[in-house]
A protein has these predicted regions:
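Active-site-adjacent alpha-helix of alpha/beta-hydrolase-fold enzymes
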Residues: 1-13
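Short, well-ordered beta-strand segments
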Residues: 2, 54-57
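A generic structural motif
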Residues: 11-17, 243-245
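Histidine-bearing beta->alpha loop at or near hydrolase active sites
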Residues: 14-21, 25-37
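Alpha-helix capping and helix-loop boundary segments enriched in small/acidic/polar residues
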Residues: 38-46
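Glycine/threonine-rich phosphate-binding loop and adjacent beta-strand/alpha-helix elements that clamp
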Residues: 47, 56-265
Length: 265
């Protein structure tokens, strides 16, 4: 998007949460599924140098023009260089949810507190039984639902169905089911499609491992809707679209890791 608008863009995209890339003593607080698997290759001592060279060139006209690319970290810690991200050569596999196994029918919570009264779990077969799937980009979930009133929301966590490892999440208020920032009035009993998009994912799904979708009213640090038990949402299927890429290792970026940081577990 920024490149198309004519901007020069360079990115270093890691799993540091709100810590600096070289704050290795804080990285070990990251849990499994939130960067914990990447700790041995997490720290980037060179990020400050990158910023310095960027500002020297663009603010002062000093030095060579920085390379315009994305340094992206996969969930297992591997770094690589991409021309842009999400990669332009990604392909997408669509998984109709009626080919998966669904447990539960309604997503419903408690007003304000966010406690779950009921949820839905959907388990899908492996995208490939022979090769690992490298998910890279913005996974989407077009969820067919029925509203009970003008309110309610769904939080979705995507997991490796074999290991239970968290891969990513998405959340949507049903009033924004068409996407965008403007709400739409939803009527009781109305059937509609929630156009959900997961936060950016770059993760490896091993061959033979299926995908699990866990649907609740809220999760992470998102606020629960005020209507709570009064606004359950019935889930009637949909389509999961998973973007993925093939890489041969030629663009892997080897980063220096200090002994203390790499063993800070």
């Amino acid at each position: 998007m920024f490149i198309d608008a004519g901007f020069d863009v360079r990115g270093m995209l890691g799993q540091w949460e709100h810590n600096y890339p070289d704050q290795w003593s804080k990285h070990n607080a990251q849990e499994s599924g939130y960067g914990g698997e990447a700790i041995e290759n997490m720290t980037r001592w060179d990020w400050g140098q990158d910023l310095f060279e960027w500002f020297e060139y663009y603010l002062k006209g000093i030095g060579e023009k920085p390379e315009l690319h994305a340094q992206i970290q996969r969930n297992d810690g591997q770094w690589r260089i991409e021309d842009t991200w999400p990669p332009l050569d990604r392909t997408s596999t669509e998984v109709p949810l009626d080919t998966c196994v669904q447990t539960g029918t309604r997503v419903q919570g408690v007003s304000g507190s966010g406690g779950s009264v009921s949820g839905v779990v959907i388990e899908c077969d492996a995208l490939s039984s022979e090769v690992d799937i490298h998910i890279s980009g913005l996974t989407t979930l077009h969820l067919e639902v029925q509203a009970s009133m003008d309110g309610g929301q769904i939080f979705v966590e995507i997991q490796d169905a074999e290991t239970n490892l968290r891969i990513g999440h998405a959340t949507m208020d049903i009033r924004y089911y068409q996407g965008g920032s403007d709400p739409t009035t939803v009527l009781p009993g109305q059937s509609l499609t929630m156009l959900m998009e997961f936060q950016a994912i770059d993760a490896l799904l091993p061959a033979g491992h299926g995908i699990r979708l866990v649907l609740t009213e809220t999760g992470e640090d998102y606020l629960a809707p005020a209507c709570g038990v009064l606004c359950p949402i019935t889930v009637n299927g949909g389509v999961l679209s998973v973007p993925h890429i093939d890489r041969d290792g030629s663009n892997v970026l080897i980063t220096p890791q200090g002994e203390d940081a790499a063993n800070n577990q």
